[in-house]
Design a protein with these regions (language model features):
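N-proximal low-complexity "stem/linker" segments adjacent to membrane-targeting elements
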Residues: 1-23, 168-221
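Short, acidic, metal-binding catalytic loop of nucleotide-sugar glycosyltransferases
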Residues: 22-31, 220-229
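Short beta-strand/loop segment that forms part of the nucleotide-sugar
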Residues: 32-41, 230-238, 259-262
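A conserved acidic beta->alpha catalytic loop
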Residues: 37-46, 236-245, 286
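Glycine-rich, basic loop-to-helix element that forms the pyrophosphate-binding segment
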Residues: 60-75, 261-277
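Short aromatic/hydrophobic "clamp" motif used to bind/position activated sugar donors
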Residues: 80, 282
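Conserved donor NDP-sugar-binding/catalytic core segment of glycosyltransferases
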Residues: 87-116, 296-328
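Conserved nucleotide-sugar donor-binding catalytic segment
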Residues: 110-181, 339-425
Length: 427
């Protein structure tokens, strides 16, 4: 009975894919078809590979989540078997019944190495997959998270673990990027923190201009928190891309408020949001960046004991670099430092942040100052910090929950040469 359709995903090395395809001979009596989702096509295509089953190649350079979800709707076999990147089947699988009951439609495999352990879908009932789509690639920081988040969101009662080691890795590829991605995925487990005080209250505000490629990642990172933000508030600053189209889907979310206005720069966009803030503190998030899943939890732990004369809490940044293929690579963690005077503030080596403002302090300062330099469209963060530092203290804590994406369209890259002129203006 040929009732299994195999999906091979994220194989970047042709020889690895050939080995994975050859290993499917172990399930040949059950194997109906194989589909390779190939972001490197035609690089990994092997026309000379002769195997006793049909193989389709799907170009997945576009959004892998969309491509997968659409393709799964066309599958007619009872089961889908997933193989990822460096996986191949081993002989032991011949002795394992690859069947699932209706109340246990998911079988997982367990991965473990010196850096982390995790599980991913292995065999899933096609009928269940069709009703339970994957997140889109534009909703997650990196494509591997599509599968981590899918399995984490599922009820444990629907899952059965594979019996024994049915797969092995063709090669281990330990690197700092893979390690950082796994650590991020682990934070998605959504542990319950019932004993964490929900006071003081915390919102997040996002100003967006033409970041349609990344906006959903930023918003989803605010939604998928281990404890929720008290308020998520987003303004589109006159984008000319499809950002407003993406924002439409969030307008019915109970904890998200979405606004749009004509383009006047980030400072005016953030000021537009201030009257709608209802929380004691607010985190500023750029539309091309994203948060760790435990961001609210960690921030609130520090806010509980913060002195009244502190108007700003800040910590460290985790930097990632966007490459031409659309994937991201880990760059570094830049640790913050304590600011004791104005000179140290203006000589800070990188943007001070992440910035968690006391809302009342922002309102007393009448929001982000609109200055003549570049029509107030640059360095609004530095301007407000200089104003706040005259009257209040800042608090640095050693925590890392904010992910900065460096890409071709980053404003800080485009306008780095303006920084010295801006500093002269402040002095």
């Amino acid at each position: 009975m040929k009732d299994i359709h195999v999906l091979c995903i994220n194989y970047n090395i042709r020889s690895d894919l050939r080995k994975a395809l050859s290993s499917l001979n172990y399930i040949l009596p059950r194997l109906n078809k194989v589909t390779v989702f190939d972001s490197q096509y035609p690089h990994t295509f092997s026309p000379d590979l002769k195997l006793p089953f049909d193989i389709d190649y799907i170009n997945s350079r576009q959004d892998l989540g969309i491509t997968l979800n659409n393709y799964i709707q066309t599958i007619e076999n009872e089961y889908v078997l997933f193989l990822f990147t460096n996986d191949l089947l081993v002989d032991k699988i011949k002795g394992i019944p690859l069947t699932l009951e209706d109340d246990k439609p998911i079988m997982t495999v367990y991965y473990e190495n010196k850096d982390a352990h995790y599980k991913l879908p292995f065999i899933v009932k096609t009928s269940f997959l069709k009703k339970s789509p994957f997140l889109l690639e534009r909703e997650v920081p990196f494509r591997e998270l599509i599968f981590h988040s899918w399995i984490i969101d599922k009820d444990e009662s629907n899952i059965v673990a594979s019996k024994g080691n049915v797969i092995e890795r063709i090669r281990e590829t330990p690197n700092i990027t893979a390690k950082e991605k796994l650590e991020f995925a682990h934070k998605l487990k959504g542990n319950s923190y019932k004993n964490v005080p929900f006071i003081p209250t915390l919102s997040v505000m996002i100003s967006n201009f033409n970041m349609e490629k990344f906006l959903s990642v930023a918003i989803q990172s605010c939604i998928k928190q281990t404890i929720p933000f008290d308020q998520i508030i987003v303004v589109d600053d006159g984008s000319t891309d499809n950002s407003l189209k993406f924002l439409e889907r969030y307008k019915t979310h109970p904890n998200i408020q979405c606004f749009s206005k004509s383009n006047e720069g980030k400072a005016k966009a953030l000021n537009y949001l201030l009257p709608f803030l209802t929380s004691e503190f607010v985190l500023e998030l750029d539309a091309d960046d994203w948060l760790d899943p435990d961001a609210v939890l960690l921030i609130k732990k520090y806010l509980i004991n913060i002195p009244q004369n502190v108007s700003l809490l800040y910590g460290n940044f985790r930097y990632w670099t966007q490459n031409s293929s659309g994937d991201i690579g880990f760059s570094k963690i830049r640790k913050g430092k304590i600011i004791r005077n104005r000179k140290e503030l203006l000589s800070y080596k990188f943007p001070l942040g992440p910035r968690i403002y006391r809302t009342s302090s922002l309102i007393k300062e009448k929001g982000f100052p609109i200055i003549d330099f570049k029509e107030g469209r640059l360095y609004e963060d530095v301007t407000i910090l200089v104003h706040l530092f005259k009257k209040y203290e800042f608090c640095y804590e050693d925590f890392t929950i904010y992910n900065v994406r460096k890409h071709a369209g980053s404003i800080t890259k485009k306008n780095h040469s303006d920084w010295n002129d801006f500093r002269k203006l402040l002095n």
